[in-house]
Amino acid sequence: MFKVFITNLGKYTEGELVGKWLDLPCNNITEELKSIDVRPNSKYEEAFITDYENDWNYNVGEYENIYSLNELSKKLEKIQKEGSGSLYNEIAHLKN
């Protein structure tokens, strides 16, 4: 399990909390960001992470890249499903 609470940064600085829990991995992060009114080339272009939960004891920073976290969660999910052999392969891949 990997969840992050994404928050619209612009609205937050205006005093309004607009956000939602996002389960990772997610197939369409862009649509999820649009659902909290975060869009490229608009008044509200940025989101940040205000809370998180995961089974991996991974500390998530406020401004971590949501797309990178999504990729990480895909790998962690794969490792969890496939077992330690997959973990070895992922570590070997990271070293190269």
Question: What kind of region is each of these model predictions?
Answer:
Residues 1-41:
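N-terminal ordered "arm"
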